[in-house]
Amino acid sequence: MANNKSSKKRVEIGERNRLQNKAYKSALRTLMKRCFTACSAYIEAPGDEAKTTLTTSLNAAFSKIDKAVKRGVMHRNAGAHQKSRLSIAVKRAIEPSVS
């Protein structure tokens, strides 16, 4: 347990940041799930509306990942890894012959 004033403050700040990062990561995971869901929906029923939904969900997820990396919530290599996963899923949905 923290004994002096500055160490108590650091504990409070760390807890605050942990909760903020947790919320940010949760929102990020939600956007990624939406993108994967849009991929499977496009595979089931390809069309202009499904493709628009797919691209908008991909853009939103990419934006959130980039912001998470910028804020320090996620390591840049982890961000690149997640963006790669999303890109591969979208590419496979749009062009099924490419695996």
From Swiss-Prot:
UniProt keyword list: Ribonucleoprotein, Ribosomal protein, RNA-binding, rRNA-binding
Biological process per Gene Ontology, one example term: translation
GO CC aspect terms: cytosol; small ribosomal subunit
Gene Ontology molecular function: any one: structural constituent of ribosome
Pfam families (alphabetical): Ribosomal_S20p (PF01649)
Family annotation (InterPro entries): Ribosomal_bS20, Ribosomal_bS20_sf
NCBIfam families referenced in this protein's UniProt entry, alphabetically: S20 (TIGR00029)
Function statement: Binds directly to 16S ribosomal RNA.
Family, as annotated: Belongs to the bacterial ribosomal protein bS20 family.
Annotated protein name in UniProt: Small ribosomal subunit protein bS20
Organism the protein comes from: Synechococcus sp. (strain CC9311)
Taxonomic lineage from the root: Bacteria, Bacillati, Cyanobacteriota, Cyanophyceae, Synechococcales
Annotated gene: rpsT
